[in-house]
């Protein structure tokens, strides 16, 4: 990724390291913008806080022989749709989460609030969202699609990730049942666009989400055709 630079008052271009010092003198909106730019640069280089938190969590789970699968935006990135995120979504069984907490709470991870599934990495200051096998995406109500067992995970970029089929299925079920999760439908469209997912994937999906996948796929195809 190209080095992100900041134009100084004198018209010269400052590298990001120097830009960090310059932003200390900017007003709050400008400072927030450049802090976000530095965060994005670190993220897309794979050296940011979120990547470090993910790798630290995954290596700990593997050392403890606790099955897991990275989900959410970090899984999207692993499959080829690059977008920034500020947290790590991880799939665990209920027993796996209990085992991890018993060994590691207070040792680099804390609960977000007493008894919460979610945690926070205290070394990287990154939120960890935990998805539990058997729970339901979207509105949380029983439905044909549920969070799978981590055993479905595949190895990708040094960590275990949800396969494309499961990731797409969960995001479609989430977006279809929770109006506050429309971005999950957008994620599916962007993944189709980024890696050219085939229409034939529809046959591997749960019947609950097949129509929506086909609808999004055809809309994305029409959009691409209109550009030429």
Which functions belong to the PLM regions below?
Residues 2-228:
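Compositionally biased terminal segments of proteins
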